[in-house]
Amino acid sequence: PPEYNKSVREFDVVTLDRIKRIDVEADFDVWKEYAYQVGIHPAVLSYLELRKENFYRMENTVDGKMFVTARGWEDLSKLIQVYEKLGKEVDREVVHQYLQHWKTAKDFANYLELYRKYQKEYGLERILAGYYEKDTLERLKFASFDERLSVVNLLVGKMAELFKEEDEM
């Protein structure tokens, strides 16, 4: 749409008659299939499952354009993966470089902190190895929906990682 792209031009009828028009809409469910195939970070997928409205945002403000796109989420995912390998933490300012909508960037950065907390608290490596404590199940039983969904997505993400490693062998 022209409001998102200044290089968009109106074509005359002769030109329009010779080209094919493809309307593209932001669709999280379609992107999610792609995301699983390319290994988007589980924290990104988990967050977007909870906050689908933040998948694609475009706003004009007095301070300029604020936006979040699928490309931004994918690039942020790659950065998170690199930071994890280096043992570095992703903070709000870094997130905002990829998600150029301050409210969404702040919300995701807060979610990422919770995600890491759940990762440590629930001992997902041990759960996947078949070992878990009774209190872990009790804690999950009484956890909020968001927390349970995050833990499920953590497990799914770790399993996807293990399957990928197995395929590469």
Locations of regions flagged by a protein language model:
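Sensor-1/coupling segment of RecA-like P-loop NTPase cores
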Residues: 1-6
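Alpha-helical lid/collar subdomain of P-loop NTPases
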Residues: 37-168
